[in-house]
Each structure stands twice: as structure tokens, then as C-alpha cells.
């Protein structure tokens, strides 16, 4: 089921809720106090900027943004051009190299071209303090991103959800698998990738599911954004 609805239509009201204002106010105050918060303010909502609701074909759920300098830019697992691919993304590239014929690991870790093709790269939590993983958990972001997933679940059909690791799988518990395709595997982090992420073939499976619906498959070779 396609939709003419936009993100603004389905989650606009959510942004007026008190908890959402409190979350934004907390993050703004932390920045004001001189703390380093990732990603930069202009990039916090990039997942929605690059992938409109009607265009979502695949969802890859992450946890919270990378907390090192110049890494996070609002897309889960992705880093800015010029920054080395972090370990989880390296394992995603390893899996792609065995799963997708002709895939060669790129020299960068920017996944913006995936987002532009309809891959919603959504973190559960949208900000983090520099060097402090999970520091912005339980602020309210989780409530907001639950609403995002609920909006996809209710307003779309045939979306492929890639849920890697217990956190993403719990987050995606309520996705209706009669309406959508839910693929589960361990997280690509070096701690768990060998337990079944490597060899999961989720990227080719996602494309098969898209083609079966008459949709264009994803070109999983990330292209650098045209500046």
C-alpha cells in the first residue's frame, strides 16, 4: 500500500507533545552548556529528510548515534564522508560482499545513497553526548521513534524491516508481519556478527521482496553524495 501521507501528516502532532518539547529542550540546554552533542543539530532528523514516508522500502533500525567526532549525521550506521567505517559497518560491508554479486567494499562509510533510495536509516535515540554511549537513552526519543515505526506499520504495506540484535527486535515487536516483511539477525557489531549476522543474506532477501512487489531493488553499493 502506497500512501500520499507525509511524515508531517503522521508524526507532526507527536512533535507538539510535552515529552517531545522536553527532549528537545534538554538537548538544546546541553549544547548551550558547552557539551558536545552528536549529531549536529541540523542533522538530527536527517533520516526523515532523506526518506519520505511514501518512499520507505526498507527500514534498518539502529540504537543511538555514533559518539565520536565527525561520525554521526542522523542516519543509522552511516558516517560522514572522510571518516573510516566503524566496526559494525565494516561487518555490514563484509556481509554485502558475500551476499550481493559484484559488491566491492567502498572506501567510505556514508550511506546517504541508501536513504535516497528508500532505506530509512533510523536510530531509536536521535542524539548522544560525545564519548558517552547511550547517554541520551530514556529522554523521550524512544517514545518518538516508537510512533514513527507505528506510523509505518499502519500507513504502509510491504516494507522490509531489518532488525539486527535484541534491541531492534524488541523495538519492532509490534510490526504486523502479515502486512510487512520482518527479517531478524544478530547485530553486526564485532561482539555478535559471527553469531549469525554474517551469512544472514538480508540485503539480497530485501531486494527479492521488493522485486516481488514490482519495486526497484536497492543498489547497496553506497555512492558518495554529490557535493
UniProtKB/Swiss-Prot annotation:
Alphabetical list of InterPro entries matching this protein: UDG_fam1, Ura-DNA_Glyclase_AS, Uracil-DNA_glycosylase-like, Uracil-DNA_glycosylase-like_sf
Protein name per Swiss-Prot or TrEMBL: Uracil-DNA glycosylase
Family matches, as PROSITE patterns: U_DNA_GLYCOSYLASE
GO CC term, one of those recorded: cytoplasm
Cystine crosslinks: none
Main location group: cytoplasm
Enzyme Commission number: 3.2.2.27
Keywords: Cytoplasm, DNA damage, DNA repair, Hydrolase
Organism: Serratia proteamaculans (strain 568)
Gene that produces this protein: ung
Amino acid at each position: 500500500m502506497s500512501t500520499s501521507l507525509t511524515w508531517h501528516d503522521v508524526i507532526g502532532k507527536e512533535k507538539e507533545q510535552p515529552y517531545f518539547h522536553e527532549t528537545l529542550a534538554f538537548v538544546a540546554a546541553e549544547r548551550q552548556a558547552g557539551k558536545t552533542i552528536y549529531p549536529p543539530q541540523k542533522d538530527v532528523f536527517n533520516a526523515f529528510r532523506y526518506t519520505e514516508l511514501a518512499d520507505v522500502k526498507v527500514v534498518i533500525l539502529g540504537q543511538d548515534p555514533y559518539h565520536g567526532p565527525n561520525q554521526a549525521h542522523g542516519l543509522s550506521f552511516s558516517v560522514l564522508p572522510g571518516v573510516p567505517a566503524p566496526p559494525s559497518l565494516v561487518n555490514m560491508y563484509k556481509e554485502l560482499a558475500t551476499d550481493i554479486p559484484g559488491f566491492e567494499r567502498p572506501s567510505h562509510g556514508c550511506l546517504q545513497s541508501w536513504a535516497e533510495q528508500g532505506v530509512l536509516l533510523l536510530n531509536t535515540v536521535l542524539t548522544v553526548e560525545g564519548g558517552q554511549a547511550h547517554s541520551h537513552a530514556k529522554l523521550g526519543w524512544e517514545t518518538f521513534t516508537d510512533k514513527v515505526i507505528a506510523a509505518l506499520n499502519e500507513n504502509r504495506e510491504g516494507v522490509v524491516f531489518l532488525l539486527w540484535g535484541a534491541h531492534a527486535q524488541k523495538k519492532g515487536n509490534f510490526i504486523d508481519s502479515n502486512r510487512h516483511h520482518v527479517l531478524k539477525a544478530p547485530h553486526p557489531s564485532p561482539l555478535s556478527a559471527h553469531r549469525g549476522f554474517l551469512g544472514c543474506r538480508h540485503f539480497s532477501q530485501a531486494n527479492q521482496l521488493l522485486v516481488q512487489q514490482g519495486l526497484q531493488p536497492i543498489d547497496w553499493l553506497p555512492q558518495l553524495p554529490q557535493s
